[in-house]
Structure formats: C-alpha cells, structure tokens
C-alpha cells in the first residue's frame, strides 16, 4: 500500500509541477521512448542474471505489495514457542522434543502458533537446530558457527532479487540517454524541416532522458530497498532464534534465554520486558490465562 502511495506522490508532484510551469502533458507521451528504455532494461536484466536469479526476482516482486508479517505479536509468539520448547526439554529431557520436531504440524506446542508453522523458513530453522541439539554430537561453538553460516547464506540468497532490481534501476538512466541520442539523431537527420518541427523532434528526444531517470529513481530502485528491508526482517527472526537457543545451551533458564532473544529485536517490534514477562507467565499458566479471558 505504501508503495502505491509513493508512486502516486511521485507522479503527482513531477507531472503536477510540470503542468504548473505551463507544460503540456501530451508532449511527454512518447511510446517509442518507453519501448526503448523498458525493452533495454528487461534485456539487461535477462543478460545479467541466471535462471535461478530471474525466478527468485519474479517470486519476490509480489511480496513487495504485502504487509510485513513480522509484527510485534509474531515475535511474541516466537519467543513463547521457544520458551515452551526449552521448558519442556528442561523438565522432561531433550529427547522429549523428538515428536515435536519430527512432525511439527501434529505437535501441540507448535500448533498453538499457526503463524510460525506457516513460515517454512523459520520453522525449518528452529526444527533443524533442535534436532542437532538433541543429537548431542555438537558443542555450542559448532552449532553457533553453523547457525552463522546458514544465516549468512540466507542473507546472500535474499540479496539476489534486490541486487537484480537495483541493477535495472541503475541502468535505466543510461538507457534513457540512449533513447535521447537516438531521438537527436533522428532530429538531425530531419534538419531540412521547418524550425517548429525540428524543435518538436528535439523535445521528444529529451523525453527519453527524463523517463529513464524518473523510472529509475522514482519506481525501480526504491523497490530494491524495500526488498532488502523485508529480507532483513527474516534475518532478524533467525538471529533471535539463534541467540535464544544458544543462551539455553549455555545453561541459562528459559525465561532468561527468551530475554536474550528479545534484546536482539528491532526496537519498533521489540516487546518490553514486562510484556514479555507477562506473556511467558501466561504460557506457564494457560489455565489462569483462559480464566482471565473468560472473565
């Protein structure tokens, strides 16, 4: 929604300001310039990326127009889930989690948090490392190094669509110049025409430079920034899981471990200490929480 609002602001201010100076919008309508700039940009995108990158970019574009699912309440659910898993392992032993991690969809603990279940990346990250911890064949430092490696791989993969769009955005001003030069060449080839017609041809040629810059910095490049922001949110969730599980492995009690995880979150979504404490207390005493809700 914000993207569409931003586009409207760009269009309204740029073209509105042009009209205020006495310009005619019809002079800016040059389909041939759009074909040159857009076609060259798409071609450069295809040339500069392999099939996997192109597919990933196409898959990422619809995500731009969806609201972020990583809200404060989802972070609370994540920390509550981790708390319940760690508390169960403390009370019943690590092997008590085997059924939960082998089939999370049938686990009573995981089923209480459908948003985590629906996030395949996050679910796999949690389950895979709990499985490694249960195996007992790796120490804390090895697990931390493996987590860092996976998070780094995730970041690299998430950067591909953003970099692809950024490359297209960076190329559009140059393709606008190409379109403008071609228009100037056409105008110079028509030098025998009256001055009024020649001036119109040169004006049409200059539209190419205008469109290239506008499309690049007003429409395409901002999308790359949004993609990076969205991928950073997923990375932050993974870092939260990492810090929480490692804290538990280092001997901290589950309430302290989730506090470690809370401190890694962005301030805009981070619950306060009191909020998290009350949420954890509700998880400890579900019957009390249900009675309160019914009252």
From Swiss-Prot:
It is a multi-pass membrane protein. Residues 22-33, 192-200 are periplasmic. InterPro entries: Flag_MotA_CS, Flagellar_motor_stator_MotA, MotA-like, MotA_ExbB_proton_chnl, MotA_N. The chain crosses the membrane at residues 2-21, 34-51, 171-191, 201-222. MotA and MotB comprise the stator element of the flagellar motor complex. Required for rotation of the flagellar motor. Probable transmembrane proton channel. One of its GO terms (biological process) is proton transmembrane transport. Belongs to the MotA family. It is found in: Cell inner membrane. The keyword Lipoprotein does not apply. PROSITE patterns: MOTA. Keywords: Cell inner membrane, Cell membrane, Chemotaxis, Flagellar rotation, Hydrogen ion transport, Ion transport, Membrane, Transmembrane, Transmembrane helix, Transport. Residues 52-170, 223-295 are cytoplasmic. It comes from the Bacteria. GO terms for cellular component: plasma membrane. Each stator complex is composed of 4 MotA and 2 MotB subunits. 2 A subunits and 1 B subunit are thought to form a single ion channel, so that each stator complex contains two channels. This is Motility protein A. The keyword Heme does not apply.
């Amino acid at each position: 929604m914000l993207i569409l609002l931003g586009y409207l602001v760009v269009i309204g201010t740029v073209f509105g300001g042009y009209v205020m100076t006495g310009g005619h919008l019809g002079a800016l309508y040059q389909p041939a310039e759009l074909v040159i700039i857009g076609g060259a940009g798409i071609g450069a995108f295809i040339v500069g990326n392999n099939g996997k990158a192109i597919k990933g970019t196409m898959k990422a574009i619809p995500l731009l127009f969806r609201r972020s699912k990583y809200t404060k309440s989802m972070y609370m659910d994540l920390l509550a889930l981790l708390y319940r898993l760690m508390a169960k392992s403390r009370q019943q032993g690590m092997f008590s989690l085997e059924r939960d991690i082998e089939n999370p969809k049938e686990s009573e603990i995981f089923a209480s948090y459908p948003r985590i279940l629906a996030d395949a990346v996050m679910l796999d990250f949690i389950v895979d490392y709990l499985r490694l911890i249960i195996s007992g064949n790796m120490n804390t430092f090895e697990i931390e190094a493996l987590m860092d490696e996976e998070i780094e791989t995730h970041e690299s993969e998430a950067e591909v669509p953003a970099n692809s769009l950024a490359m297209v955005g960076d190329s559009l001003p140059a393709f606008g110049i190409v379109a403008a030069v071609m228009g100037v060449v056409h105008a110079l080839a028509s030098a025998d025409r009256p001055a009024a017609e020649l001036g119109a041809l040169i004006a049409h040629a200059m539209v190419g430079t205008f469109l290239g810059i506008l499309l690049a910095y007003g429409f395409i490049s901002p999308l790359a920034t949004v993609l990076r922001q969205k991928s950073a949110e997923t990375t932050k969730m993974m870092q939260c899981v990492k810090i929480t599980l490692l804290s538990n492995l280092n001997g901290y009690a589950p309430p302290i471990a989730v506090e470690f995880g809370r401190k890694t979150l962005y301030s805009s979504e981070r619950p306060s200490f009191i909020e998290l404490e009350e949420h954890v207390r509700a998880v400890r005493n579900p019957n009390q929480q249900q009675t309160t809700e019914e009252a």
